[in-house]
Amino acid sequence: MAEKRKYSRKYCKYTEAKIDFIDYKDTSLLKYCLSERFKIMPRRLTGTSKKYQEMVEKAIKRARHAAIIPYIVDRKDVVTNPFEGI
């Protein structure tokens, strides 16, 4: 039988920084929860708490609606650092 993987405990970046509100215009806060294709990453990968994950999701959806963050990225346009040009 294969051995179980041991993962290190992930901590919420937003609770450590004591952030009350996540603004949709602040892309530097949102980049921790986005993949290289601008998909919202799940809590188990980012380590954010439930409260902040809901706030981040809402802020990302608002930023997409305001055209600050793109909805989708083609395979050709995938970059290593998605926030270089912003």
From Swiss-Prot:
One of its GO terms (cellular component) is cytosolic small ribosomal subunit. InterPro entries: Ribosomal_bS18, Ribosomal_bS18_sf. Belongs to the bacterial ribosomal protein bS18 family. This is Small ribosomal subunit protein bS18. One of its GO terms (biological process) is translation. Keywords: Ribonucleoprotein, Ribosomal protein, RNA-binding, rRNA-binding. It comes from the Bacteria. Pfam families: Ribosomal_S18. The keyword Acetylation does not apply. Part of the 30S ribosomal subunit. Forms a tight heterodimer with protein bS6. The keyword Isomerase does not apply. HAMAP family: Ribosomal_bS18 (MF_00270). Binds as a heterodimer with protein bS6 to the central domain of the 16S rRNA, where it helps stabilize the platform of the 30S subunit. One of its GO terms (molecular function) is structural constituent of ribosome.
